[in-house]
Amino acid sequence: MTYLINKKNQKIAYKASKGKGPGIIFIHGLNSDMQGLKAKYIHQYAKKNNLSFICFDCRGHGKSFGNFEDFTMSDWKEDIINIIDKLTKGPQILIGSSMGGWLMLLAAQARPRRIAGLIGLAAVTDFGNNLYNNISVKNKKILKKTGIIKYKSFGFSYYLRTKFFKDANKNNFLVKKFNFKKPMILIQGMKDDVVDIDTPKKISNKINGKNIQIIYLKS
């Protein structure tokens, strides 16, 4: 395993292969990691087409430093920006899965000149309030008292702190327009029971650019 060491001396695990540009960076989803099938298939595509490729684990995920509940959207945004700044050269295509789609948009806002294009795979943004609203009244009281709760969703469970919800709202993408003229593709499954089918349209409506495609899959 290869690691990038950040300014706090924390390890960010990543995999990389060399190739021509524009490079590809894959960003995983919430409570996921770079070991998923999407990352593997995209890596295979990059190798076949001689494109540089990087996938990584955000802090608190996979092989990277720390526990999941100790980090926020701002931390993970910092991770992808570190990957772009320290491990890549030239234009990059960001591919974000689920929450990774939110992070790719935040990274594009922070480093617009480094982005060649964006591809969202069931990309979802601004979900802090939705997560909070799904918490039971009992657990909201526990969260208020202790600052942390065990969150269960679609067969998975993980811990979330009060700071996660507050920070997520500070990073909401849909609050203002984003001037982005590079190609963007948003791919969404019509039977997705996690990401709302209208999410790609909501994202598209906040982009000041015409080079946007929304692709719906029947699955």
Residue ranges with predicted function:
Residues G101-P112, L118:
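Short glycine-enriched nucleophile-adjacent loop
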Residues I207-S219:
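Catalytic histidine neighborhood in serine/cysteine hydrolases
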